[in-house]
């Protein structure tokens, strides 16, 4: 299998359809993780998966797991927790901290993390540019002081939110953040959430599989349409529960 080497002065990607058919989804490798390359990747259904020997590996996954916000499913046990209301959810309150916690989180069947320092730096740059966002769930500790308990981060381009990674220091904290974030994003105009991988965790929230060609077409339509309002930095209320 020949792995395409991505040119440092050209952010274009090879056709993901070829990678899916012949290379197990591996689209190419690059020596950089520039913001421009990341944005080009997401808009074409490609994302960086890991760093090895100084090379960044870029993948496409198909069929693609996605969530359509209006079809979000909140499991009954989580809905009960949400109604309890002892938590607080915010967006973009502590982006770097969320990414660092995601990098440190233990993952089943994984040796270490793919979120190397180079990834953290790259996504912080996207955050500063207004593309990457974090959602945080806070809980009061034994002294009544509110502390970060879980959350997730991802990238928003147009009306698509590309989820990246989650963490939880307290049971259900990342799920609470996600359940509150989806209606919030929908209110701002987000029409599709990319889950990347087909996981049991996302299936509980109502994820569905799109053939990659259909997913790519949705991206072409939605990435060019701006949100009704910027995501910003604010409190996020859970509604409809």
Swiss-Prot record:
The keyword Acyltransferase applies. Its EC number is 2.3.2.6. GO terms for cellular component: cytoplasm. Signal peptide: none annotated. Its main location: cytoplasm. It is found in: Cytoplasm. GO terms for biological process: protein catabolic process. GO terms for molecular function: leucyl-tRNA--protein transferase activity. The keyword Cell membrane does not apply. It catalyses: N-terminal L-lysyl-[protein] + L-leucyl-tRNA(Leu) = N-terminal L-leucyl-L-lysyl-[protein] + tRNA(Leu) + H(+); N-terminal L-arginyl-[protein] + L-leucyl-tRNA(Leu) = N-terminal L-leucyl-L-arginyl-[protein] + tRNA(Leu) + H(+); L-phenylalanyl-tRNA(Phe) + an N-terminal L-alpha-aminoacyl-[protein] = an N-terminal L-phenylalanyl-L-alpha-aminoacyl-[protein] + tRNA(Phe). Keywords: Acyltransferase, Cytoplasm, Transferase. InterPro entries: Acyl_CoA_acyltransferase, Leu/Phe-tRNA_Trfase, Leu/Phe-tRNA_Trfase_C, Leu/Phe-tRNA_Trfase_N. It is an enzyme of class 2 (transferase). Belongs to the L/F-transferase family. NCBIfam families: aat (TIGR00667). Functions in the N-end rule pathway of protein degradation where it conjugates Leu, Phe and, less efficiently, Met from aminoacyl-tRNAs to the N-termini of proteins containing an N-terminal arginine or lysine. This is Leucyl/phenylalanyl-tRNA--protein transferase. It comes from Neisseria meningitidis serogroup A / serotype 4A (strain DSM 15465 / Z2491). The gene is aat.
